[in-house]
């Protein structure tokens, strides 16, 4: 599950912002 204002990416990352393809980050980035 992703944080607030984030969406799941098919590659298992969380995306924030509108340009999801440019803002993908790994889950739980410390």
Swiss-Prot record:
Belongs to the AVIT (prokineticin) family. It comes from the Eukaryota. One of its GO terms (molecular function) is toxin activity. It comes from Cyriopagopus hainanus. The keyword Metal-binding does not apply. Expressed by the venom gland. Keywords: Disulfide bond, Secreted, Toxin. Disulfide bonds join 2-15, 9-24. The lineage of its organism: Eukaryota, Metazoa, Ecdysozoa, Arthropoda, Chelicerata. It is found in: Secreted. GO terms for cellular component: extracellular region. Its main location: secreted. This is Hainantoxin F6-34.84.
